[in-house]
Curated annotation (Swiss-Prot):
Disulfide bonds: none annotated. Keywords: Ribonucleoprotein, Ribosomal protein. Belongs to the universal ribosomal protein uL30 family. InterPro entries: Ribo_uL30_ferredoxin-like_sf, Ribosomal_uL30_bac-type, Ribosomal_uL30_ferredoxin-like. One of its GO terms (cellular component) is cytosolic large ribosomal subunit. Pfam families: Ribosomal_L30. The keyword Thylakoid does not apply. This is Large ribosomal subunit protein uL30.
């Protein structure tokens, strides 16, 4: 059975954000603006996305 995946895209710059928010974005596998990452939908990933929801766009 395939695990559900979600696509996360960085849509706002991390300049001027808190250090732990920058670390969370890096942990999601995002580097540059408009970079995307496909991640397995787990509670840990959902929590990371919720923490930086003002910086990212989520699909799927």
């Amino acid at each position: 059975m395939a695990d559900k995946k979600i696509k996360v895209t960085l849509v706002k710059s991390v300049i001027g954000t808190k250090q732990d928010h920058r670390a969370t974005v890096k942990g999601l596998g995002l580097r540059k603006l408009n970079s995307s990452s496909e991640l397995i939908d787990t509670p840990a990933v959902r929590g990371m996305i919720q923490k930086v929801q003002y910086l990212v766009k989520v699909e799927g």
